[in-house]
Every structure is written in C-alpha cells, then in structure tokens.
C-alpha cells in the first residue's frame, strides 16, 4: 500500500481520509495539476503542471507517472512512532516552511488536533509498527489532504526529537519490553528548526 501512491490513495479513501483525486491523462480538463512517479520519493520528478502542452511534455519525462488534482495549501510532514503491537506513541506534525530537494530546511512543530486525529486513524488502520512519516496538505479552509505514508523516519525527524518526542529513548524502552502509552505532552508546540549549509576550509599545507 505505502510503496504505490495509487494504492495509498485508494486506502485513504477507504477509511474516510481526504486525498487528492487521481486523474487520467484523457480526463484532465482543468489546470494546474500535479504529476509525479507513483513509486517515487522526495521531490524527484514531481512537478506542478499549468497547461496541456506542459502536461504532454512531463508525461513523457516522469517515470511511472500519476496525475492528481493540485491542492493549494500548507505542506505538512508528520513524524510518528508506534510500538511493536501497532499502538501509537507519538504523532508530531510539522509545517514544511522551506524545502530543498524534497527535504525541509525550515520547519515548525504544529500540534494541530485535526491532523493528529486523522494521522492516528491512518496508523491504526495500517497497523504500523515502529517509525513512520506521513505527508499532507492543509488548505485555508482546514481541509486535510493526505498524500503518502513512508515507513521510516523522515529526513527532519530530528525536529520531532528536539521538540520533546524522545523517539530514541522510547525505542530503547520498547526493546526492553516496557509498555508505553500515547504521549505528546512533552512536545513543544511551535518549536522551529532551521538547517544551514556550513562551509569548512582546510589548508593542506598545515
């Protein structure tokens, strides 16, 4: 389900979770639309398409393409942790304020109750065990369109950890057989991460 975005979309629909509608090439009537590989990751080969001519070009470039309606709104990543029985322990949504090559370089924790509720529904339906990362777009009228589930820690999971998620400590507790409960109370809402590119200089003669 999680490795094929077509199956992921059908799964979301089956449990009452909003997701962008998939559109066949011949049925595209309005623009913009969004195109990407149905088995891709990050932002590789992912494009907003604004007209028919561009779509006809991108459909030949993008491998294993899937076309969906374009949803305008705030992008979110949700860092999640479940125990080995599928019980949810942490759900930490964060806004993707600035993105480079599919990875957030500026992000802020937002403990949005609706996102947390929908994410818990997804995790419980999938019976996810361990770490997972869920992507969605939240519109201005508070509709939440979920787009993918990745069964791993995200590239910026350190924000969830730094804000109080303590994923590593909980995994150690799980390995020791301790029973844990869902707990977001230690997470700092609004906590911000900014990533910088650092340059280091070395003199080979010294």
Model-derived regions: residue spans:
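Residue-level detector of family-conserved "landmark" positions at structurally sensitive sites
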Residues: 21-23, 133, 183-185
């Amino acid at each position: 389900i999680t490795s094929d975005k077509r199956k992921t979309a059908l799964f979301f629909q089956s449990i009452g979770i909003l997701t962008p509608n998939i559109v066949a090439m011949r049925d595209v009537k309005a623009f913009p639309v969004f195109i990407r590989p149905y088995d891709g990751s990050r932002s590789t080969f992912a494009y907003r398409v604004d007209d028919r001519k561009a779509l006809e070009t991108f459909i030949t470039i993008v491998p294993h393409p899937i076309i969906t309606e374009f949803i305008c709104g705030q992008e979110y990543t949700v860092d999640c942790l479940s125990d080995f029985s599928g019980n949810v322990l942490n759900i930490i949504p964060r806004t993707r304020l600035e993105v480079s090559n599919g990875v957030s370089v500026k992000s802020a924790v937002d403990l949005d109750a609706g996102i947390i509720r929908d994410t818990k529904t997804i995790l419980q339906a999938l019976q996810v065990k361990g770490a997972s990362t869920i992507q969605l777009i939240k519109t201005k009228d508070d509709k939440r369109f979920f787009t993918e589930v990745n069964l791993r820690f995200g590239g910026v999971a350190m924000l969830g950890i730094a804000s109080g998620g303590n994923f590593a400590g909980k995994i150690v507790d799980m390995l020791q057989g301790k029973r844990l409960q869902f707990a977001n109370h230690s997470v700092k809402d609004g906590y911000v991460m900014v990533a910088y590119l650092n340059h280091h200089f070395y003199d080979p003669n010294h």
